[in-house]
From Swiss-Prot:
HAMAP family: DnaA_bact
Residue span of region Domain IV, binds dsDNA: 329-450
Originating gene: dnaA
Chain spans, region Domain II: 79-111
Source organism of this protein record: Geobacillus sp. (strain WCH70)
Subcellular location: Cytoplasm
Protein name: Chromosomal replication initiator protein DnaA
GO CC entries: cytoplasm; plasma membrane
Length: 450
């Protein structure tokens, strides 16, 4: 194994991609590798509060990340600076040893799923309502509702939560069901290891004999030809045997680069649904649910402050809440809006960029093409109105966080499929139409000046 300090830096680099910036900077950034004793990696935490939090929340993630990098199974032990002697430490109960892939039971125990990610703990809002409904339908009737179910959206918006929730629901209602959740990176790494060890049949048996396959971040298969080939056959086997497949990505299938057309086509067989960033009301609801689950007593004004400042994704939002609570505990002061501002000053930009709304887009597009605002919501189909309306829908999809149904509502209650059609049409035209490119550029420049 490589030098433990180099290894720890690599581990931190991988974990930084998986968790929110506030969580990483609060809990992991200041940690250091201390030593490796047998199969236990000892990590220095800055204080006892951080040590206990890391042990209860991050041991499993760290162990899995180390295994992904090295193929080694290590126990994780956190210590604090005044107590760095390794002679007398005891293993923490939460530091589990992870078995190697082909020593794992083919029963795929429920422990593979995060117990906190259930439908009950999922906060429904306008940006995720359709994805939640589709996920619940799949969980209630695997391989009968939508197969595959393809969920896409930005980092930290709840895709993984829904996938785990599906797994929990299926197991709860059918304890004998074989449910497996994994990332595409883990699928790739296990496939490589199986080829290296000349055990491809073990790998295939493992993933082609399940009832529900939940595979996260499928975009990372892009460019990996052999792995795509293997997943193609895994997909076919499961689909032909009426087994449920749920896939997540940060973008829709058609936008994943270097993805084989035959895979792209299969991903589009079922239902494709997106998740967009939560609106203010949903962000506040998420904070309330998180605070209740963790036993935090947070004043409403503090939750409102955090929700107003963090609007990117749920992971960042919850990470900010944890950072505020940690800061309050460490300096032994009551949680207030002022304390929250102090705790979050390093992660909140001093000036936030203006949020562009659908109304902004309609106004600027209307001025550009000399059409009235009410025309965007009217039923007129003349080209002089319909084409600018499609451009406005396209820009609403590109420049706002609004869901497809929300965009449709703002254009006279049109169906979300109309928005999809408009976006696809303008996207295609932009590839060859220089005049349209000029229009879009001019409109975007005007929007930036608002």
């Amino acid at each position: 194994m490589e030098n433990i300090h180099d290894l720890w830096n690599r581990v931190l680099g991988e974990i930084e991609k998986k968790i929110s910036k506030p969580s990483f900077e609060t809990w992991l950034k200041s940690t250091k590798a201390h030593s490796l004793r047998g199969d236990t990696l000892v990590i220095i935490a800055p204080n006892e509060f951080a040590r206990d939090w890391l042990d209860s929340r991050y041991s499993r993630l760290i162990a899995e990340t180390i295994y992904d990098i090295t193929g080694e199974e290590l126990l994780i032990k956190f210590i604090t600076p005044p107590n760095q002697s390794e002679d007398d430490f005891e293993f923490q109960r939460s530091s589990k040893k992870h078995r190697k892939p082909y020593e794992e039971s083919t029963d795929f125990p429920q422990s593979m799923l995060n117990p906190k990610y259930t439908f009950d703990t999922f906060v429904i809002g306008s940006g995720n309502r359709f994805a939640h409904a589709a996920s619940l339908a799949v969980a209630e009737a695997p391989a009968k509702a939508y197969n595959p179910l393809f969920i896409y959206g930005g980092v930290g918006l709840g895709k993984t939560h829904l996938m785990h929730a599906i797994g929990h629901y299926v197991i709860e209602h059918n304890p004998s069901a074989k449910v497996v959740y994994l990332s595409s990176e883990k699928f790739t790494n296990e496939f490589i290891n199986a080829i290296r060890d000349n055990r491809p049949d073990d790998f295939r048996n493992k993933y082609r004999n399940v009832d529900v396959l939940l595979i996260d971040d499928i975009q990372f298969l892009a460019g990996k030809e052999q792995t795509q080939e293997e997943f193609f056959h895994t997909f076919n086997t499961l689909h032909e045997e009426s087994k449920q497949i749920v896939i997540s990505s940060d973008r829709p299938p058609k936008e994943i680069p270097t993805l084989e057309d035959r895979l792209r086509s299969r991903f589009e067989w079922g239902l494709i649904t997106d998740i967009t960033p939560p609106d203010l009301e949903t962000r506040i609801a998420i904070l309330r649910k998180k605070a209740k689950a963790e036993g935090f007593d947070i004043p409403n004004e503090v939750m409102l402050y955090i929700a107003n400042q963090i609007d990117s994704n749920i992971r960042e939002l919850e990470g900010a809440l944890i950072r505020v609570v940690a800061y309050s505990s460490l300096i032994n002061k009551e949680i207030t809006a002022d304390l929250a501002a102090e705790a979050l000053k390093d992660i909140i930009p001093s000036t936030k960029p203006k949020v562009i709304t659908i109304q902004d887009i309609q106004r600027v597009v209307g001025q550009h093409f000399n059409i009235k605002l009410e025309d965007f919501k009217a039923k007129k189909r003349t080209k002089s109105v319909a084409f600018p309306r499609q451009i406005a829908m396209y820009l609403s999809r590109e420049l706002t966080d609004c869901s497809l149904p929300k965009i449709g509502d703002e254009f006279g209650g049109r169906d979300h499929t109309t928005v999809i059609h408009a976006h696809e049409k303008i996207s295609k035209l932009l590839q060859t139409d220089a005049q349209l490119q000029k229009h879009i550029k001019e409109i975007e420049e005007k929007l930036k000046q608002l």
